[in-house]
Structure formats: structure tokens, C-alpha cells
């Protein structure tokens, strides 16, 4: 029989610049906020990193994550790799919700860090306003190691 060698878990402690470098190409995230009763609310989201090193997520102001952040700014984001078994990291920080009209140009920046240039920025801006979008911005103040799952190291 041919058995693969067991994969050993990793946990690499990183600086803030190394953290942001790890996050930038990854856009699959799980955002956790706190409900009014103190329990966790988690949502799968698409996110990026802005020029100031904050995690940015586009959403709608009526969503539970926004309601929760307006009440309690504490948030946690797990950033996943495209490969589910790939490296991931948890980032904690203070979150804020930016509403329209202030959010329009921030949503342009969000799109750029996720997907690059849009073919028609005027159309994109109109769509963001028509859809009533907002932006969540999280400033990292604590993060775990960049980790992978597997067997505990010996």
C-alpha cells in the first residue's frame, strides 16, 4: 500500500507587513461579529486589504454584520486560502461601517484590491449607489499565526 506521509501543522508568527502580504491575494473570509446577546454571528464574505492596511468588505447596511458592528466594533476575520487545506489566519480588530455617499470612492478602492480595474467606473459607482452598498473596514490590532492544519508537530 502507498500511504502519504502525514502532514504536520504549522503556525508561523508574522509581523503586520507580513500579515498584509499574506492576506492581499486571498479574498475568501469569514467575518465574526457580536450579536446583542453577546453570541457570535459569522458570515462568509469577500474581502481585501486597502492601502492603509485595513481589511475591507462590501455589504449592505441592513445586514446583521453591520447592525452588530454599529453596536460593538469588535470583529474577527478568518482569511482562508483558495485551497481549503491551505494556510489561514485570524485577524481581530475594531470595525467600522462607512455608508453612502462617503462609501462610494471606498467601494471603488475595494473593487480595485479584489478584481483590479473596472471597464466602466461611472457604471460601477451608479450600481453601488443604486444597490445601497456600504463598506466595512477593520483595522488589525491582533492576529494569530498564519497556520495550516495537520498533525501536531513533535
Model-derived regions: residue spans:
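Amphipathic alpha-helical interface surfaces
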Residues: 19, 65-68, 103-110
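Short secondary-structure boundary segments
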Residues: 81-82, 140
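Charged, gly/pro-rich active-site loop segments
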Residues: 1-14, 87-154
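Generic structural signal for secondary-structure transition and capping sites
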Residues: 27-28, 74, 119, 143
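Short, conserved active-site entrance elements at the starts or edges of catalytic domains
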Residues: 3-36
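Short beta-strand segments
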Residues: 26-61, 67, 75-79, 88-91
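Alpha-helix boundary recognition
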Residues: 23-24, 70-71, 129
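Short, surface-exposed beta-strand-loop junctions and turns on beta-sheet-rich folds
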Residues: 63-65, 84, 152-153
Amino acid at each position: 500500500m502507498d500511504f502519504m506521509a502525514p502532514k504536520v501543522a504549522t503556525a508561523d508568527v508574522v509581523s503586520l507587513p507580513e500579515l498584509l502580504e499574506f492576506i492581499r491575494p486571498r479574498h475568501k473570509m469569514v467575518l465574526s461579529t457580536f450579536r446583542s446577546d453577546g453570541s457570535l454571528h459569522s458570515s462568509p464574505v469577500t474581502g481585501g486589504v486597502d492601502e492603509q492596511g485595513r481589511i475591507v468588505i462590501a455589504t449592505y447596511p441592513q445586514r446583521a454584520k453591520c447592525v452588530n458592528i454599529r453596536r460593538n466594533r469588535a470583529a474577527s476575520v478568518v482569511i482562508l486560502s483558495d485551497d481549503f487545506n491551505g494556510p489561514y489566519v485570524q485577524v481581530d480588530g475594531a470595525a467600522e461601517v462607512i455608508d453612502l455617499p462617503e462609501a462610494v470612492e471606498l467601494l471603488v478602492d475595494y473593487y480595485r484590491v479584489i478584481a483590479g480595474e473596472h471597464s466602466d467606473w461611472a457604471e460601477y459607482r451608479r450600481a453601488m449607489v443604486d444597490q445601497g452598498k456600504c463598506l466595512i473596514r477593520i483595522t488589525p490590532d491582533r492576529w494569530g499565526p498564519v497556520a495550516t492544519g495537520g498533525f501536531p508537530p513533535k
